[in-house]
């Protein structure tokens, strides 16, 4: 009897196609990856596909990452999904804003593959 191993699902949210492509390349070996290009799409996908973790860019058109994170964390159907803010803005104030909106972690661009994988594994290992 074959054992089926189910990969955890990661939602990558970034308005830059190159960042999504790089993140997908880094993550696709260990995770199922879905993508969104703005906060509104992220909320829809979080509700319909229930990812195990969300990597959310902070600054995007249509709806920024902080607003989307807050909406995801307010919704009973998605509030337990960890959100990791991934952004070029590493100021302490922005980190605190992300935490206030419900973000679980933070990764600053540019990041190494190990930075991203380590943060996801850390967040997924936290009960």
Protein language model regions, located:
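Active-site beta3 strand of CheY-like receiver
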Residues: 49-55
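Two-component/phosphorelay signaling modules centered on CheY-like receiver
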Residues: 17-34
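C-terminal output helix
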Residues: 111-121
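Receiver (REC) domain active-site loop signature in two-component systems and cognate sites
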Residues: 60
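Short hydrophobic/Thr-rich beta-strand motif most characteristic of the beta2 strand and flanking loop
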Residues: 31-37, 45, 107
